[in-house]
């Protein structure tokens, strides 16, 4: 899930965020198909991202905030269950038989912190919370925060191979029939921000309604709160991506 750009685009394509998300996903899957272990795939994909970024960018970033970064939730099944590796605020919701949903990742805490930050900035500058990340009043704070990425524990997927040593990981017990809902923070907002579901209800709805219906529900909530006054956020809508899996 590529982080929204905060300045000039440096890479070819639709956006730097879109380039990194697509590039990273392709490289991770390619290395897994070649037999790499999950940690090896992450390390190699980061190396490739750094190499490609340095070769194709229009110019070097003037500061860290110009560098493309993304969140990631990467899961791989093996004989012991499922291994999850992640950066940032993507999440994996794990539903086992007769057990509550387990949320893997740091997304809930990060979303809550962001909502508080948005509300505080909006009040300070007299803006609607969802005025947009390109507002000068927001850009300064967002760029300052982005400059801390890949320092002091704030690591993300990006063109920096050093991040491989800081990827979060968890071994997930996943017996046959276990359901996993992988999602970006924009999709998880149904539970983390908009209180339309809790974790269990969101996984159940994904199975009963399908992901497309949930995305439509998500956009309807956002459409009814365009200024972000009920649900503070930097943008009216964020990218929402989800994948529903079942262990066989």
Predicted regions and their residues:
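PP2C/PPM-type serine/threonine phosphatase catalytic domain
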Residues: 2-248
